[in-house]
């Protein structure tokens, strides 16, 4: 029996196998001593090397590697770069630290080849010891060993992980000089390095100069453009891609979804299906995210169908289940979100966080907090930063100051989660909504991190609710420095001045907006009719085919609401115009147009769901609440802050928003 046919290692260290290998090696040595030809000796040595390589492939721990290394030393193969390279790569594969064992392996080798050096460089890089990896490359060059393409691949990966752009450029230059650039996988690694170093223009230059590309070259750059929000360049590359695989389609679908272009995401998903590519879990999750942004029930139903058709039942796939919970919540159907949550066999922190956030945005604070308490006391799942955002948002949307403080204090004290700017935003929002503006300002001053625009924006929004121009100016000053081009901040300050009757302040802000060349985001509300068609409404929109009927319905509705005591809240109009002009402006707000259209086109018992891109004003909130009473309709209204469920004259927010 030859060495090549010796028994392979079992899953544990097996002395019998080692003993058998020793006997075979001894027999081989005797045979070689009796052999008369160099050819026979060479063949026997090749069999020995082949057997050792095979045994290294089967190693599952360091002890087994050391036993093989012992045989290598005893048989005089300690100078074999081929075997030692394999040994080093096996150490790396098993996660064994390079120091001290790997270094001891290579130090006695007199003539180290580039593959052995590369194995060591790669091992240090994978271990995260990038300085050592670079130092090993320096030693290699001192020995005048010419690097191979694999060497540059390992070094470029290390530069990408370190995000060291300057070092990456140096290796790029050396790669080009030594013609390692000719290999596709080296070019791909270079693209990846530049992408990780946030130098996408350099990545594109590498791509354009590559003599040969594969699908990875294309998809790496497409995904990079998508991550930075440049969907135009991503689409241009995608359309040029000769063969579009699942990775490329996924990059486009998820890219559009993540960059707030849900309609395009759905279009690319449809194209993918028509091309015969089967969606994977990530693509389906991207599709569901796009549906959530559109906020229409017809998309929600199709998302469920696609998930099930693709073999990703929410009950068994936690990623899909969590995405569906988020989607149903954002489409206004929190009950269905709860049903999905209850049906899931496995839940993780993202599942609980999605459900807590869903309940919070729909004004069901006690249910959200109960679920949070259940998760932290009855399961082994630990809350993360998103979970705490959901719990704090529940408190904020319902004015639960004491409970909010308890949740906030428990973050670090109980769970070791350091509060972030987003958590401070929730606390400032909670204190501000309840009129504790000075306390909210003091909290900001004591923050352990620099506040971002969200923190100051929450305070400015609270000043709008409670008509406090003094603190509003403090918040606005910080906002204008942090977010100088966000027009919403200027409009919010203008509204504070308008509510206080300070029209001079309003004019100053408007002048500032004009000087900066900022453009106001136009308000738009939309609903989906019974046929699945989306209808969009803009302020004073007269282009809709039913505009005359909509205006008549609004006038009729105003008359009915007036009987209940409705009077337009003129403070919601931040313009120094007559009261009559303010009334005309208010009646043309987009959500009111959408409501009138829905009353004309829906069945008596059906729920009306309206989506809006901006925050609903105080007058529209009062209007919707009273409309739900006189029409007997359930009206679900989602603005850019939260959901409002209007039923029988009441709102789920308890008029606290």
UniProtKB/Swiss-Prot annotation:
Query: Can the keyword Nuclease be found in this entry's annotation?
Result: no
What would be an example GO MF term here?
zinc ion binding
Q: Which PROSITE patterns match?
A: PPR (PS51375)
Mind telling me which residue stretches traverse the membrane in this protein?
A: none
Q: Which GO terms fall under biological process for this protein?
A: RNA modification
Keyword set for this entry?
A: Repeat
Question: Which intervals of the chain are annotated as region Type DYW motif?
Answer: 563-657
Q: Where is this region: Type E motif?
A: 455-530
Similarity remark? Belongs to the PPR family. PCMP-H subfamily.
Q: Which protein are we looking at?
A: Pentatricopeptide repeat-containing protein At5g44230
Query: Which organism is this entry from?
Result: Arabidopsis thaliana (Mouse-ear cress)
Question: What does the record give as the organism's lineage?
Answer: Eukaryota, Viridiplantae, Streptophyta, Embryophyta, Tracheophyta
